[in-house]
Design a protein with these regions (language model features):
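Cytochrome P450
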Residues: 1-407
Length: 407
């Protein structure tokens, strides 16, 4: 059968049933309501699997809308490859990928084993003093002011400073790092994205060469001197590993803690509960992670198959929005509420062979933020007459969050 064009002018492959076609860009769809997570949850009223021919950046893709289907695909690395998850190699014209993120089993395991010692619970525990010091340093700048613009004053800086310390990078470079990272992840201009990716690559290559001559007891030296099955990593393997840390360290946690503080500022009862019962903060962190999945990763179908009664063809892309799994009412009671006692599984940090290596670090960072803010400030809120702002291109993020509080 031949492909057809739908009324919006998009080409629909012949194997896609017309009733599964959804003519929207999911990021624009998310902006139709005051809360993008509630907005995209409207997709739960339709099929469990839809096809979007005109989604972000012109990449037609399947979109699973339910937790179970998303979880099943995450767990099936054989039929759903992660090799073109982000596709930096295509933009740069290089033969290496972000690893282990874009490496399929079994090869990915060697790369995970290089990084795992630096992110396991015992290693994160050793970092706690540094993480809390960074948080307190930033809070001290506005603690007596009665309020702040949370994104610029804290959320963008806190996880970034932690990341810079982990990799031994200078804070003075942070404005440039932000510019490259934001352009690469969020710009609709492909030329600008390519230029940003090249800027990141060139800087990191120079830095890694300098660090070869300056070994330290840290993560970068650990990567530079690592071996897999008795052989050292080559240049591309090292670059792929450091670049995946760059993107994860500068954006994902920073974007996430904006949503968490926004939620807290709108939920006075949750503030009181956590302040009076700080032992519940880890549970709150888990359910905030569940409720606010900010990333939609990508998989590529490796063979013709049928799922949810629909044919998928080898080479089809699948968008994996954590925010659709997060708010699935089939999986969670009252999914839009954050409940520290929920104790429910989620896929915000992915699952299966590509579950997030930095999960323990991210959870500890988030917990420290909640601990330090709740210990200092009462009745954290968005001031009357002010509004928060957010965006849904790339990693979903709060871009402005004015806060005031009582002492």
């Amino acid at each position: 059968m031949a492909s057809t064009a739908d009324p919006a002018g998009f080409i629909i492959p012949a194997h896609v049933p017309p009733e599964r076609v959804w003519n929207h860009d999911i990021n624009a769809f998310a902006r139709e309501l005051d809360d993008p997570f509630v907005a995209t949850a409207r997709l739960h009223d339709g099929p469990d699997l839809i096809y979007s021919p005109g989604t972000a950046r012109g990449n037609p893709c399947w979109i699973p809308t339910r937790y179970k289907l998303l979880n099943d695909i995450f767990m099936d690395a054989k039929r759903f490859s992660s090799e073109q998850n982000i596709g930096v190699n295509l933009l740069l014209g290089v033969d290496w990928r972000l690893n282990p993120l874009e490496i399929d089993p079994p090869a990915h395991m060697g790369y995970r084993q290089v990084l795992q010692p630096w992110f396991q619970p015992s290693a994160v525990k050793e970092l706690e003093g540094m993480i809390r010091r960074v948080a307190c340093e930033l809070i001290a700048a506005f603690e007596e002011e009665g309020g702040c613009e949370y994104v610029d004053a804290f959320a963008s800086l806190f996880p970034s400073y932690v990341f810079l310390e982990l990799l031994g990078l200078p804070r003075s470079m942070l404005p440039q790092f932000f510019e490259w990272e934001h352009t690469f992840i969020r710009s609709p201009d492909m030329g600008a994205r390519i230029a940003a990716a090249r800027g990141i690559k060139d800087y990191l290559e120079t830095y890694l060469e300098e660090r070869r001559d300056d070994p330290r007891d840290d993560l970068v030296t650990g990567i530079l001197t690592a071996q897999i099955k008795g052989r050292p990593l080559d240049h591309g393997e090292i670059m792929g590993m450091v670049m995946v840390l760059y993107f994860g360290g500068l954006d994902t946690v920073a974007s996430s803690i904006g949503w968490y503080m926004r939620h807290l500022a709108k939920d006075r009862a949750l503030q009181v509960r956590l302040r009076e019962n700080p032992e519940e903060i880890p549970g709150a962190v888990d359910d905030m992670l569940r409720a606010y999945g900010v990333v939609a990763t990508r998989r590529t179908v490796t063979e013709d198959l049928t799922i949810d009664g629909v044919e998928m063809r080898k080479g089809d892309f699948v968008l994996m929005p954590g925010y659709l799994a997060s708010r699935d009412p089939r999986q969670y009671d009252d999914p839009h509420m954050v409940d520290p006692a929920r104790k429910a599984r989620h896929v915000t940090l992915a699952t299966g062979v590509h579950n997030c290596l930095g999960a323990h670090l991210a959870k500890r960072e988030i917990a420290i933020v909640l601990e330090e803010f709740l210990a200092r400030f009462d009745n954290i809120r968005i001031p009357e007459g002010e509004q928060d702002e957010w965006q849904t291109e790339g990693v979903w993020a709060v871009t402005r969050l004015p806060l005031v509080w009582d002492r």
